[in-house]
Amino acid sequence: MTIDPDTAKLGRTPGLDEEHFAHDGLITKHPVRAVALAALRPMPGQTLWDLGTGAGSVAVEWCRTDPTCTAVGVERRADRAANARANAENLTAPGQFTVIDHDLTEGLPDGLPTPDAVFIGGGATAELVGACLAR
């Protein structure tokens, strides 16, 4: 399930400690991630949009629940998108979590797959929520 065999021992239960993620200090903390994943209720084969993904911790946790779950993270800051990509590479299966560099104030990026769930990690606006609901 993971590229790094050392991360296999972490299991699939959401709530990985922050030490397992590349991040700049701005990360959804592990208790919040565990509760968010319980509310999102990932099922095999489902897709998550993680908007304002930052380190990608919610998307990573989503993907780790089942090897057929996928996620797309959208992040405007290149440094945070790079951290999310590193976390995708180290903590999920290849191709399971994709990160798109995009500023959500310009709307949703083109070509996103239809989501089964959406997590807005930062910058939630009425317009963004409306755009998500319209999909």
Q: Where in the sequence are the language-model features?
A:
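Class I SAM-dependent transferase core
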Residues: 1-44, 49, 83-86
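Redox-cofactor binding/interface segments in oxidoreductases and associated redox assembly factors
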Residues: 119-121
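Conserved SAM-binding loop of SAM-dependent methyltransferases across substrates and taxa
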Residues: 55-67
